[in-house]
Amino acid sequence: MAALRVGTRAVEGRFQASNGGGGGGGGMAPSSRLVAAHREAKPRSSHSAAPWKLPRRRAGAMPLWRVAVFASVALNVATLALLLHHYATSPPPHHHHHDAGLATRSSDAAVHRRARTASSMAPSTGKPAVTTDSVINLDHGDPTMFEEFWRETGDAAEVVIPGWQTMSYFSDVTNVCWFLEPELDRQVRRLHRVVGNAAVDGYHVLVGTGSTQLFMAALYALAPDAAAAAAGEPISVVSTAPYYSSYPAVTDFLRSGLFRWAGDADAFKGDSYIELVCSPNNPDGAIREAVLDPKTGNGRTVHDLAYYWPQYTPITKRASHDIMLFTVSKSTGHAGTRIGWALVKDRAIARKMTKFVELNTIGVSKDSQMRAAKVLAAVSDGYERRPEQTKETMTTPLRLFDFGRRKMVERWSMLRAAAAASGIFSLPEETSGFCNFTKETAATNPAFAWLRCDREDVEDCAGFLRGHKILTRSGAQFGADARYVRVSMLDRDDAFDIFINRLSSLK
């Protein structure tokens, strides 16, 4: 059609030019360029050598340009009629096919958007994969062993947070810990009741960025106020050796005038102190009690129960100390969520600890709290039937503590066999007890191995193992002999298997 119109305009131009400058019929005068072109053109033959003249139109005949215009209009009308006829006689379109196409395209677009979002927000994978020649880093207690369990839970531990949620600083202004999410409070109490490892009735639940922040908050809350500290010595912070290596580092990091690290509790002779009791103990897994009697002096105690869970040790009693610290990193393996909690009896102490977190970080990430609450709920669901469930509707439960204990029993068996095969390493004796949670006798399987190198020419066990591409933490950092090292038992299977093979080959 467009080509036809272009051709018509060309024809019209030629016929208009033939009408002359003032002839009848309303024709337009030819352009000066067209006339000049005809004047300059060479004759095509001897018959056309005479000067070129505009032909005259016959009287009474219809101009040819009008014929061309009429033909063009007729052609357009005919074409339009054919199109209308085709549309009128065609069957109606199937709207459900059209809608399905739109839905498919919309669905595809949504998938692509999600893929782009997932790609742009892909999380880190943590430590790189290892090979038989890799350096195996077991210095940190990175609990990636639990990834295997959580991969099988589907959406049981997933949480979706809309963009408008968790925007306020505040969670519950009526609570002592005003930035604690109510759902995390509920799930913490629920899990402790399910496991039976700590009392929760009559306790304040406080949340922190890991239990380390709450440990610092406890020191702040238990220490004398600034005026009293200025008039005397900072209060001493002690723990029985071997003690957790971060205790002295964290205590003295800011060089506070309120408290200072004073070393082994067994060697302490002062009156004012804060004793840290880690049970099961990091690094050796021993069950600990306070060694200092607060009745004989001005002493307070903080119980670090990060490892008091059924996968590591029998649950022999329901702990009910004044201040108890826990963390999701060792209970469920979610170290990257950075959530810890404290159970605190005294309201005034709870307020001071909350004030420390407020001044330190203005609260704790609500997003992390919501994820931690969902994770803890998934753990409890594995052992506790929900009210809406019946025996018929219950699916096979995914039980974290069963998985954890099975893995730890297997790994400790492998480690003891490797130490025996090498002949130069020794481990603490295995202990056991009746577990109120599993209702059976269970052995202790600590999250860390307290490994000693018995070879006479090795005085630095960490250095010796480093030479064989095994990174551990020296016993010297725990207030103990450098012949000892702490070894994480919580890494992925591939790294742990390589470690076992290397250890068994050392002589």
UniProtKB/Swiss-Prot annotation:
CDD domains: AAT_like. It catalyses: L-tryptophan + 2-oxoglutarate = indole-3-pyruvate + L-glutamate. One of its GO terms (molecular function) is transaminase activity. Disruption phenotype: Strong dwarf phenotype and pleiotropic developmental defects affecting all organs. Reduced endogenous levels of auxin. Residues 91-135 are annotated as: Disordered. Keywords: Aminotransferase, Auxin biosynthesis, Pyridoxal phosphate, Transferase. Pyridoxal 5'-phosphate binds at Y169, S211, T212, N282, D304, L305, A306, Y307, T327, V328, S329, K330, R338. GO terms for biological process: amino acid metabolic process; auxin biosynthetic process. The keyword Transmembrane does not apply. Its EC number is 2.6.1.27. Gene3D superfamilies: Aspartate Aminotransferase, domain 1, EGF-like, alliinase, Type I PLP-dependent aspartate aminotransferase-like (Major domain). Pathway: Plant hormone metabolism; auxin biosynthesis. Pfam families: Alliinase_C. Its cofactor is pyridoxal 5'-phosphate. Widely expressed. Disulfide bonds: none annotated. The modification N6-(pyridoxal phosphate)lysine is found at K330. It is an enzyme of class 2 (transferase). Probable tryptophan aminotransferase involved in auxin (IAA) biosynthesis. Required for auxin production to initiate multiple change in growth in response to environmental and developmental cues. Functions upstream of YUCCA1 in auxin biosynthesis. Required for polar auxin transport. Belongs to the alliinase family. This is Tryptophan aminotransferase-related protein 2. The gene is TAR2.
